UniProtKB/Swiss-Prot annotation:
Main function: This b-type cytochrome is tightly associated with the reaction center of photosystem II (PSII). PSII is a light-driven water:plastoquinone oxidoreductase that uses light energy to abstract electrons from H(2)O, generating O(2) and a proton gradient subsequently used for ATP formation. It consists of a core antenna complex that captures photons, and an electron transfer chain that converts photonic excitation into a charge separation.
Keyword Signal: no
Membrane spanning stretches: 21-35
InterPro entries assigned to the protein according to its UniProt record, in alphabetical order: PSII_cyt_b559_asu, PSII_cyt_b559_asu_sf, PSII_cyt_b559_CS, PSII_cyt_b559_N, PSII_cytb559_asu_lum
Protein name, per record: Cytochrome b559 subunit alpha
The record's free-text note on cofactor binding: With its partner (PsbF) binds heme. PSII binds additional chlorophylls, carotenoids and specific lipids.
UniProt organism field: Cuscuta gronovii
Length: 84
């Protein structure tokens, strides 16, 4: 048989009024803050990822796929020149 650590049981915590008063405010607040973080575009700025309309340039609408086995550096340089 295990000893008592003096901590409240999980059932006691989630059935208490105090738990639900605190979490009925914090859980929706976190959800709304996350939604605003993404919907305003701040997530793109913070993490440095391109926005959906910035993945490809106007003259390049596909991924730069290197197909040459023996000349990959030349193909990469060609893709770089085309994208500028």
């Amino acid at each position: 048989m295990s000893g008592n650590t003096g901590e409240r049981s999980f059932a006691d915590i989630i059935t208490s009024i105090r738990y639900w008063v605190i979490h009925s405010i914090t859980i929706p607040s976190l959800f709304i803050a996350g939604w605003l973080f993404v919907s305003t575009g701040l997530a793109y700025d913070v993490f440095g990822s391109p926005r959906p309309n910035e993945y490809f340039t106007e003259n390049q609408q596909g991924i730069p796929l290197i197909t040459g086995r023996f000349e990959p550096l030349e193909e990469q340089n060609e893709f770089s020149r085309r994208s500028q």
